[in-house]
């Protein structure tokens, strides 16, 4: 396990990020539904920001988008709110969870539109994986998220071994 209750790591709160983006006609099909690829682009960007904040010195690259659930449609004119946090750290890899909400600015309603789990890897200047700080698990929620992330990581490694 790569977690710590000491000061040599970082808390998930130190690297979390949130952003809001207005969806434009160029982001959508002729019926007004936002393309999934547009959402994936923003998911990858914010996950990369969280991973970079955690890794510090190292460059980070996306290894996989392990889960992307589109739960509700997003439309032109919606404000899309992406909230991202780090759940799990191994030696050089980091699992980032991104929650996607869509706000209808006309009626002020917000729906949970999707969730993504993204794995990023820290690399050095030679493109080789490099160690990142451990996670400081300072509350029960962070401990639970870490354990769930560890379970998902083991599952991903088993799936990769089958390929």
Predicted region positions:
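HotDog/MaoC-like acyl-thioester-processing domains
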Residues: 3-13, 75-76, 87-163
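Hydrophobic beta-strand-centered segment that forms part of the acyl-chain substrate-binding groove
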Residues: 12-14, 34, 48-94, 111-115
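Short amphipathic
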Residues: 12-25
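Residue-level recognition of specific faces of alpha-helices
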Residues: 20, 42, 64-67
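Generic structural detector for well-ordered beta-strands
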Residues: 20-23, 69, 119
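A conserved, well-ordered hydrophobic junction motif at loop->secondary-structure transitions
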Residues: 28-41
């Amino acid at each position: 396990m790569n977690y710590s209750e000491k000061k040599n790591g970082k808390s998930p709160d130190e690297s979390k990020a949130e952003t809001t983006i207005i969806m434009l006609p160029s982001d959508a099909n002729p019926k007004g539904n936002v393309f999934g690829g547009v959402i994936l682009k923003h998911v990858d960007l914010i996950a990369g920001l969280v991973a970079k904040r955690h890794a510090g010195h190292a460059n980070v690259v996306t290894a996989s988008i392990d889960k992307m659930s589109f739960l509700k449609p997003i439309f032109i004119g919606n404000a899309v709110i992406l909230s991202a946090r780090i759940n799990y750290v191994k030696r050089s890899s980091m699992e980032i969870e991104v929650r996607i909400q869509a706000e209808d600015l006309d009626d002020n309603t917000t729906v949970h539109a999707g969730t993504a789990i993204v794995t990023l890897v820290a690399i050095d200047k030679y493109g080789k994986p490099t160690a990142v700080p451990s996670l400081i698990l300072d509350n029960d929620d962070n401990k639970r998220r870490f354990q769930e992330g560890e379970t998902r990581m083991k599952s991903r490694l088993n799936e990769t071994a089958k390929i």
